[in-house]
Amino acid sequence: PFLNPSVLTQLDLPIPNRDSTPLLLEPLNLNREFIPSKDIQAYRHLYALDKLEGTFWQGYIKMPLFKLHVQVYQPDTEKIKGTVFLLHGYLEHSGIYQPIIRELLDQGFSVLTYDLPGHGLSNGNAASIQNFDHYQQVLHAVHQYVKNADQLPQPWLGIGQSTGGAIWMHHLLEYAQLRKNPIVERVLLLSPLVRPAKTSWWHNPVGLGIIRRIKREVPRHFKRNNHNPEFLRFVRLKDPLQPRMMGMDWILAMSKWM
């Protein structure tokens, strides 16, 4: 459903980017109607988020380490089945999850999703993180911000893709050890990050030790990890919010987390 960014130019709309677009986000406020600015309209149009039915809110949540881009969607239905916390994977962002957001809304669920630090419209070094524990701090900060929101009724469910799945696994295991109830009642893990593929160069500690001494980031290699060629082409060639480099800090943080 995504557009070629050139369409935005034809419509006299700005193309989203990680430098200027986040500066135009307002604090997330679920207590009033959200009216997007021209730049946010462009973002929503590019990723077909403006085609979703229901009510939406968009903005940022400020926390000690990060300024996080958050989106909330509520379906047009009298009885909402619950709320899904949708977490994307590494080198992705929440905008490209429009199809699954649409499906969840059609099924009668509210949806909360956010860009991980260093991704999409959230701040932080691009495609990087200093410590995987920061992902847990972000999850808890978002939970504290929205836990009493009428738009996000119980039960709360979690969906996580790749690194998003790792975030949920970390949360569930940590809370199990503490004998505390987790944020969500159930989770759906999509290709969760458990360990890097053995074919990945950073799976080799010798290679990782050498590269970390000479590089702060390495080029990203786009893989065919989807059966939709149009989607793969958009991600590789057209999406202005796709990172082109992988941060070594993220790779090292992942290695320590494992």
Residue ranges of predicted features:
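Catalytic nucleophile-loop/oxyanion-hole region of alpha/beta-hydrolase
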Residues: Y90-I96, H119-L152
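Conserved alpha/beta-hydrolase
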Residues: S94, I101-G124
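An N-terminal hydrophobic leader/cap segment in hydrolases
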Residues: P1-K62, K67-D76
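Alpha/beta-hydrolase fold nucleophile elbow
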Residues: D150-S162
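Short beta-strand element of the alpha/beta-hydrolase
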Residues: I80-G89
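Alpha/beta-hydrolase-fold enzymes
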Residues: Q161-W250
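Conserved serine/cysteine hydrolase catalytic core
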Residues: S255-M258
